[in-house]
Amino acid sequence: MTKFVRKYMFCLVLVFAACSLVVNSIRTPPLKNTVNGGEKKNADIEQAQTHHKKEISKNGGVEMEMYPTGSSLPDCSYACGACSPCKRVMISFECSVAESCSVIYRCTCRGRYYHVPSRA
């Protein structure tokens, strides 16, 4: 009986580990932003994608998708729910000249502020 339970638990752990690996390895390409100057951002993304394709054809190696690193402006496309137009606004705080002021982005629609969704 305990042998069966051990095998069952081992199979269960193995299935969960495999599912975890699959979920963590799936990545989606960056979204094209159309809010607040999205045309320029779309052109930058497309240029980076075509540059990457040229690199692959030159090197003739294994294709790997590249994702931008570092900070980027938040996307408010889905932050406001059904309310539209949802726009990104910058909120800054008064601070002394010696220190740097933090900048916070919020999504706003019809006078209401919504939390900016994080990219995970």
UniProtKB/Swiss-Prot annotation:
The loop (92-105) connecting the two anti-parallel beta-strands (85-91 and 106-112) confers the function to the peptide. Residues 1-25 form the signal peptide. InterPro entries: EPFL. This is Protein EPIDERMAL PATTERNING FACTOR 2. GO terms for cellular component: extracellular region. Belongs to the plant cysteine rich small secretory peptide family. Epidermal patterning factor subfamily. It comes from the Eukaryota. Keywords: Developmental protein, Disulfide bond, Secreted, Signal. It comes from Arabidopsis thaliana (Mouse-ear cress). Controls stomatal patterning. Regulates the number of cells that enter, and remain in, the stomatal lineage by inhibiting protodermal cells from adopting the meristemoid mother cell (MMC) fate in a non-cell-autonomous manner. Mediates stomatal development inhibition. MEPF2: mobile signal controlling stomatal development in a non-cell-autonomous manner. Uses ERECTA as major receptor. Inactivated by cleavage by CRSP (AC Q9LNU1). May act by competing with somatogen (AC Q9SV72) for the same receptor, TMM (AC Q9SSD1). Expressed in leaves, especially by the MMCs and their early descendants cells (stomatal lineage cells) including guard mother cells (GMCs). GO terms for biological process: guard cell differentiation; negative regulation of stomatal complex development; plant epidermis morphogenesis; stomatal complex development. Its main location: secreted. Disulfide bonds join 76-107, 80-86, 83-109, 95-101. One of its GO terms (molecular function) is protein kinase binding.
